[in-house]
Amino acid sequence: MRIIFTCGGTGGHINPAIAVAKLCQERMSDCQILFMGAEDGMENKLVPREGFRLETLKISNYQRKLTPAGIWHNVTTLFHMAGSMQKAKRVIREFQPDVIVGTGGYASFPALKMGAKLGVPTAVHESNAVPGLTTRMVAKDVDRIMVSFEDSRSQYADPEKVLVTGTPVRGEFLYTDKAAARAELGLGEKPLIVSAWGSLEIGRAHV
């Protein structure tokens, strides 16, 4: 089994793909996995750290604010898109995947779009209740849309494509022993308050 996972931008897109990739390796000893992401995304740190090969594309997100800087950014994004599509095509033909799985983020668009065009089975997972821009753009092309919530099914033009799976998480979250974790952190019986943050806004978090 040969699988391409395509994702990028934020950990919320990357970590679910890593979780599924690890599970595939555990259950299929002959499984070969390749990741595709953006040149400057968090995936460049997170994916190799988990031991997976990563192919990168020169691609960026679209700016919603149509300021002069935003317009220029979008023009540059469109310029790079053609090259990203061609590289995605080359990588897909060389790797010969059995399936391409995207977990959202702008970096997943070229591989999903090109994979569908080349006749490779494709699927996209959307963790958010309301689909993001990339998911909306590839929804008509992919073979399967996986979502975290039953209510999200109505967000798509073809509900028959939609499968409710929940959001993938790493296996260690499911089997961690509470007492052992507290001991490892040296907490003893002290009360513990956890403040959980995510995505790119974590840099602004403060108490």
Predicted segments with their positions:
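A short helix/loop element that forms part of the nucleotide-sugar donor recognition site in Leloir-type
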Residues: 72-73, 174-187
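Conserved small/polar residues in nucleotide/adenosyl-binding loops
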Residues: 205-207
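Conserved nucleotide-sugar phosphate-binding/catalytic loop shared by glycosyltransferases and other
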Residues: 3-10, 30-83, 165-167, 197
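Active-site-proximal region of nucleotide-activated glycan assembly enzymes
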Residues: 42, 53, 116-179
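Conserved donor-binding/catalytic core segment of Leloir-type glycosyltransferases
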Residues: 4, 187-202
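Glycine-rich phosphate-binding loop signature in dinucleotide/nucleotide-binding domains
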Residues: 28-29, 90-98, 185-188
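Glycosyltransferases and closely related glycan-assembly transferases
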Residues: 87-100, 107-123, 136-141
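Short amphipathic alpha-helix
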Residues: 13-25
